[in-house]
Swiss-Prot record:
Belongs to the peptidase T1A family. Keywords: Cytoplasm, Nucleus, Proteasome. GO terms for biological process: ubiquitin-dependent protein catabolic process. The lineage of its organism: Eukaryota, Viridiplantae, Streptophyta, Embryophyta, Tracheophyta. It comes from Oryza sativa subsp. indica (Rice). NCBIfam families: PRK03996.1. CDD domains: proteasome_alpha_type_4. Its main location: cytoplasm. SUPFAM superfamilies: N-terminal nucleophile aminohydrolases (Ntn hydrolases). The proteasome is a multicatalytic proteinase complex which is characterized by its ability to cleave peptides with Arg, Phe, Tyr, Leu, and Glu adjacent to the leaving group at neutral or slightly basic pH. The proteasome has an ATP-dependent proteolytic activity. This is Proteasome subunit alpha type-4-1. It comes from the Eukaryota.
């Protein structure tokens, strides 16, 4: 039945479904997992790298975590070429707002603007939906720390803890069970690593398979800080959480 209605994004099925949008969400389900946890003093993002071959030369740049503005970052799950287009669009929105109003763009306003773009690709002929989901982490003076999730349909919503990518339903269930209000960033990191260790396809967690980023306020100055965890620091975090063995000393 679906084959009659899935050739174009502008055609609803008799059940009221847009199959191309659903197929885009299926593409995200095959991507590496990404988690976001909202803490009292920041937001934590953790992502799983998909290393397809040991011959692949991994770049120094991030694969799952991206900075959009000084107060806003995101984790990505899905088709990276699609994500790059949307990331550039988001950065352009942020810079235009800063140029016009001389202050950082509110987090939800940027998320809504980007989701309007994504929604447009589900409504007009000759286009296909973006096969990517985002977890946005940021801070602004209006609502403090915030975590948003968006999908290919253009929908977005605010979350205390969220997961996208492979095994996201299992991860979401664990987050719902173990999350509590008022967590510190350190506790949020431990929770995210614990959930990822139980839902990843890989048998064991290693620093090379993970990316971790945090958005928090710098002590003293109160400025928003975006920080990416180094592989060395990631290894120590995994060892501290009891999720991997520390490397033997030479």
């Amino acid at each position: 039945m679906s084959r009659r209605y899935d050739s174009r994004t502008t055609i609803f099925s008799p059940e009221g479904r847009l199959y191309q949008v659903e197929y885009a969400m299926e593409a995200i389900g095959n991507a590496g997992s990404a988690l976001g946890v909202l803490a009292a003093d920041g937001v934590v993002l953790v992502g799983e790298k998909k290393v397809t071959s040991k011959l692949l030369q991994t770049s120094r740049s991030a694969e799952k975590m991206y900075k959009i503005d000084s107060h806003l970052a995101c984790a990505v799950a899905g088709i990276m070429s699609d994500a790059n287009i949307l990331l550039n669009t988001a950065r352009l929105h942020a810079q235009r707002y800063a140029l016009s109003y001389q202050e950082p763009i509110p987090v939800e306003q940027l998320v809504q603007s980007l989701c309007d773009t994504k929604q447009g690709y589900t409504q007009f002929g000759g286009l296909r939906p973006f096969g990517v989901s985002f977890l946005f982490a940021g801070w602004d003076k209006h609502h403090g720390f915030q975590l948003y999730m968006s999908d290919p349909s253009g929908n977005y919503s605010g979350w205390k803890a969220a997961a996208v990518g492979a095994n996201s339903q299992a991860a979401q269930s664990m987050l719902k069970q173990d999350y509590r209000d008022g967590m510190t960033r350190e506790e949020a990191v431990a929770l995210a690593l614990k959930v990822l260790s139980k839902t990843m396809d890989s048998t064991s967690l290693t620093a090379e398979k993970l990316e971790l980023a945090e958005v928090f306020l710098q002590p003293g100055t109160g400025e928003v800080q975006y920080q990416v965890c180094s592989p060395e620091a990631m290894g120590k975090l995994l060892a501290k959480a009891g999720l991997s063995q520390p490397a033997p000393e030479a």
